[in-house]
């Protein structure tokens, strides 16, 4: 398998070599903690203990690297475990990070409640504004953190432009690519140093696994991250790794359907009198539309909107939905909706990252589009 193959082919075959003993075309689940050695130090394939390495996890990590066009992929027990490993690898007490002013609530909590306790400082900036990012950088800035599209406001950051700003400051650019997936966007090719994923979401794609990933190109950074991954221990288990690998095989076809349905829903919302604003980068009037069109293959399956009537009206929409399941997370084959202010982003309440109280976030699934439109129309009233 080479990088000359198309994304769809890599998704199915990269890291997925046939089992040498049986010829099984799907990598086995190596549900094992330790490995027999051929004499002291005589490791087979470098495997000694599954926290350090496991063949099923290796297959996933090779696949992740291929899909993002990176040198090394690392799989973790959750997206936040991946982020924590990255912070501990890149930063020391007194260092500074620029994060988005609309970051995922869990990421904000990690910086505000955990990293800050061991001396890491951060400031927030509108990362869709390159000048604002530049202004937020200090002499102690070691990383610029970007989500694009962002969660839950669907903001778009020009990855290449911010990469230049970070590079000039001697800082690394970290891009959370969860909302886009590597099928729609490949940040390393645009100048990012690190790509972060919650593989729970589109990569797994079936709402049955929790996982995270980091992908990098720099060999030295890859080795440092691998050291911390092993030292900290929050690795993906073999069954979880296998589930993500299984999900990735259909990532391309799923993302095409997610995007198709999301585009139709965004158009419906723009015409509905109960909606005051639609946040979807595929709409021509979205402020990041042109940049998204430049750096993404398509616009993805996430849509947020604001409801006329305020917070209670937004909550009522969530409660009236039937086909859209009220729940947190995103990226599965089934459609979900939530009230971010009371659910996924409750930890940002009272902070500069607090989300609008009238906001509803949709994770648009791959069901029949007409069925989804009908359910949303009745939920809006």
Which stretches of residues belong to each language-model region?
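Short, well-ordered beta-strand elements within core beta-sheets of diverse protein domains
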Residues: 244-253, 300-308, 361-365
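Conserved N-terminal alpha-helix of the aminotransferase class I/II PLP-enzyme fold
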Residues: 34-84, 106-113
